[in-house]
Amino acid sequence: TLAAAQGGARCCHVDASKGMVAWARENAKLNGLEDHPIRWIVDDVNKFLTREIKRGRRYDAILLDPPSFGRGKGGELYKIEHALLETLQLVRKVMSDQPSFLYLTSHTPGFTPIVLKNLIQELLGEGQLDSGEMLLTGKESALDVPSGTWARWKK
């Protein structure tokens, strides 16, 4: 969200965790971005996307970092292996007719770069797709530590 806002994008940051949204807002403030156009939404992403579809809102770019596991306000259970496909189908419906990109990350074992790439390929079809591992590199170690995976689709 912050990188997109810093680049001039109008952003909508959605997270089901009130604490995470508060932390992200504080991070925006610490980085001098408190006056940038960012909508901070505490909500279940699938419920939010469903409302945005009904409102006719469309987005040119989506950055999606779903949790492996979570619980909603009403005790609803979110497990990425059961919910991600629905989330991606809703994402497709809110993307504009001329989308710029979709960036998807995962920190869930088994969700390899190829898995993410295949999910996006099925969803969006034509476009440039690439994927990889997120790595933590240490100054004092020659070893990289994997911290997740990513896939990016762009027109």
Give names to the regions the model predicted.
Residues 15, 24, 42-44, 63-66, ...:
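Active-site proximal loops enriched in glycine and acidic residues that flank catalytic Cys/His/Asp
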Residues 95-97:
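Helix-to-beta-strand junctions that scaffold the AdoMet/dcAdoMet cofactor pocket
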Residues 1-11:
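Conserved SAM-binding loop of SAM-dependent methyltransferases across substrates and taxa
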Residues 99-155:
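C-terminal catalytic and target-recognition region of SAM-dependent MTase-like enzymes
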Residues 16-63:
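S-adenosyl-L-methionine
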Residues 10, 37-39, 128-130:
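Conserved beta-strand segments of alpha/beta enzyme cores
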Residues 19, 42, 60-90:
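Mobile active-site "lid"/loop adjacent to the S-adenosyl-L-methionine
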